[in-house]
């Protein structure tokens, strides 16, 4: 058990799309028929990048696997479940409708997935 689990926490700035775990990323990639290069993963549980430019490049690759409102729903649930397990009681999540729009989602369907 993590010794800080008993302390209530706040996540005051997080980009929802950036919370996707490598496991969920691989799952969405398979489901949405997106081929991913294994060099984006440092391990089963982490991503790998060399510098900020590489981070942004790989962030865009990772977010490219999110295609549907259902993907956003699963991503949101997964992230908030992890927050609850770590006693995070307050979250200010930033969401990017730009990624959703690039995949053909309307703003309304995107929000339905997140909410």
Predicted regions and their residues:
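Metal-cofactor-binding active-site regions of metalloenzymes
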Residues: 1-115
């Amino acid at each position: 058990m993590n010794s800080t689990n008993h302390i209530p926490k706040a996540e005051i700035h997080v980009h929802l799309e950036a919370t996707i775990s490598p496991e969920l990323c691989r799952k969405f990639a398979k489901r949405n028929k997106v081929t991913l290069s294994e060099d984006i993963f440092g391990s089963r549980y982490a991503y790998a990048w060399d510098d900020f430019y590489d981070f942004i490049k790989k962030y865009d690759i990772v977010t490219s696997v999110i295609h549907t409102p259902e993907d956003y729903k699963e991503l949101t649930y997964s992230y908030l479940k992890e927050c609850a397990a770590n006693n995070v009681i307050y979250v200010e999540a930033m969401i990017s409708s730009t990624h959703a729009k690039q995949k053909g989602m309307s703003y309304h369907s995107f929000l339905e997935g997140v909410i």
